[in-house]
Every structure is written in C-alpha cells, then in structure tokens.
C-alpha cells in the first residue's frame, strides 16, 4: 500500500505512522509534538496505559521519524493561527476511513482495510521481529498481556498456513 496513491497525503502519513508505532486512530488524531521526546536510545513517543495513570515510552523507528520530519515541515508552513501543536491534521474519522479504503483499492487489496489495520500491522511485525508479548502490550498501551494475545494468535495461524504451503511445495 505504501507505494500506492492515497486520496490524501495526511491520511497516508498518519496510517503509516500508526503501522510503525501501534497508535490507535484517536491517538494519532490527538498526537501533539510534546509527546515526542529525545532519549538516550533516540526518539520516543510517550503514551498513556489504558485504565492507568502510567505512561509508556514507544521507540520511534526510522520510517516513522521520516514521517515526523515531513509533518514538522508542514506544521512550520502553517499560518500561526492554524498551529495547534497537533502532529497530524486529519479529516473526520469517516473521511479518513474512506481514504484508506480507496487507498487499499488503489493497491489492489481486496480485504477490509481500516485504520485499525495499521495497529494490527505494527503488532504482527513486532512479534515477527521477536519483540516480547509483554513489551508489545506495553507499547500498545495495554495493561495486560491477554489483550495482546490476539496478535500472537494471528502469528500462530500464519505459521500454520505457511507450514501447509511449504508442505504442498515439497509434495511430489
């Protein structure tokens, strides 16, 4: 999808940023520049943990940093009266999801793609990279690992499906 045309560049950047950080749509819509900090390990994003006063730090990977640089340039070009410290200036939720559906269609994706797909992408990529389920749950702002188990189940089903494909490839 990344290389396909999207009806709005802001939608594309916000969706991809969520793919790289695991933020929910509302969190991306409300994300402010003061939630992004420089730490010893690079840029991090601070986010609340559900049903808690805690805050967790999520590392910002290079592709997400590039999106932030683009957003920062766009922010700097806004007239002073339009600056509200939000990182992304997005359309309504309905329009946002319409853009995502059109974008998926442009990418020849037949599945139901919506903003939540970006969080699923983040979680499955993190687990495939070997990130611990507990760490993933924290990065996603979840206060228990059980809530993140759904992503591990997706990986297990994917593994089973790939195992069958491998078996079929080697059967004579």
Language-model features and meaning:
Residues 50-69, 81-102:
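C-terminal catalytic core of Y-nucleophile DNA break-rejoin enzymes
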Residues 1-25, 29:
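Basic, Lys/Arg- and aromatic-enriched nucleic-acid-binding interface segment
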Residues 21, 30-70:
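Conserved tyrosine-mediated DNA breakage-rejoining catalytic core shared by Y-recombinases
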Residues 14, 18, 71, 104, ...:
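Short helix-to-turn junction characteristic of helix-turn-helix DNA-binding domains
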Residues 35-42, 110-112, 131-151:
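Short, polar N-cap/turn motifs at the start of nucleic acid-interacting alpha helices
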Residues 3, 56-59, 66, 70, ...:
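DNA/chromatin major-groove-contacting recognition/catalytic segments
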Residues 10-12, 90-94, 110-129:
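Short basic/aromatic active-site micro-motif
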Residues 49-53, 93, 140-165:
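Catalytic-site neighborhood detector that most strongly recognizes the C-terminal catalytic loop/helix
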């Amino acid at each position: 999808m990344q290389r396909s045309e999207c009806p709005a560049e802001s939608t594309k950047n916000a969706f991809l940023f969520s793919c790289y950080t695991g933020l929910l749509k509302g969190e991306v819509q409300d994300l402010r520049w003061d939630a992004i900090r420089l730490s010893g390990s690079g840029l991090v994003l601070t986010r609340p943990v559900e049903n808690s006063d805690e805050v967790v730090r999520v590392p910002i990977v290079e592709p997400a940093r590039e999106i932030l640089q683009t957003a920062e340039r766009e922010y700097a070009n806004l007239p002073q009266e339009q600056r509200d410290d939000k990182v992304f200036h997005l359309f309504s939720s309905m329009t946002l999801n319409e853009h995502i559906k059109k974008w998926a269609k442009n990418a020849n994706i037949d599945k139901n793609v919506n903003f939540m797909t970006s969080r699923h992408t983040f979680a499955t990529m993190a687990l495939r990279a070997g990130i611990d389920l507990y760490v993933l749950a924290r990065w996603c702002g979840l206060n228990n690992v059980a809530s993140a188990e759904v992503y591990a189940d997706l990986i297990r089903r994917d593994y089973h499906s790939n195992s069958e494909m491998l078996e079929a490839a080697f059967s004579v």
